[in-house]
Curated annotation (Swiss-Prot):
Organism annotation: Streptococcus pyogenes serotype M1
HAMAP family registered for this protein in UniProt: GlcN6P_deamin
Annotated metabolic or biological route of this protein: Amino-sugar metabolism; N-acetylneuraminate degradation; D-fructose 6-phosphate from N-acetylneuraminate: step 5/5
Protein name: Glucosamine-6-phosphate deaminase
EC number assigned by the record: 3.5.99.6
Encoding gene (name): nagB
Catalytic activity: alpha-D-glucosamine 6-phosphate + H2O = beta-D-fructose 6-phosphate + NH4(+)
Membership in a protein family: Belongs to the glucosamine/galactosamine-6-phosphate isomerase family. NagB subfamily.
Amino acid sequence: MKIIRVQDQIEGGKIAFTLLKDSLAKGAKTLGLATGSSPISFYQEMVKSPLDFSDLTSINLDEYVGLSVESDQSYDYFMRQNLFNAKPFKKNYLPNGLATDVEAEAKRYNQIIAEHPIDFQVLGIGRNGHIGFNEPGTSFEEETHVVDLQESTIEANSRFFTSIEDVPKQAISMGIASIMKSEMIVLLAFGQEKADAIKGMVFGPITEHLPASILQKHDHVIVIVDEAAASQLD
């Protein structure tokens, strides 16, 4: 696990984009993408660049259960607003949050991931150490699954909604086992509220109580953090 400290999120996005360009030069064709505030500067760099992504496939980590793609809080909407509208891909995959059978949808999405090995996976990290929506206690062997979101995650995400009651209580998420199959993982974290999770991920025991700790076992992980998020690493 390589740690890169940056001044701010803007610099972090630039470095992540440089890593992506290197990966594309080596033949990467499938990107694993994340939502939330952490990767926004990275997507801004992609949008500003002259690069064409129309031969690439993207697979997103997760989607809320119960939100249509037109909801401005759906991750499908987020990706279109922040990346896909400006930079079309050959194919974009996200779980269907309105599937009538969410367990069947999880299995369908898992098959999509199996058919498109991820070359470059972007991750954020939750305050409780979750990656994707893999909450503490999730098995490291888990593949795509339906998640009951923890109160801490609902509270953290409520800032994007009118009220905390509007935050969905479930999501469909790529599992930890699937994430670990990615060729390369770039994790972005900014802000003091991520410091505990980053410390546990880097130094803590590998435990399902802190899902991101499993990344210690991956051969090619780069962690991009600002000084606040890295404040407990010294």
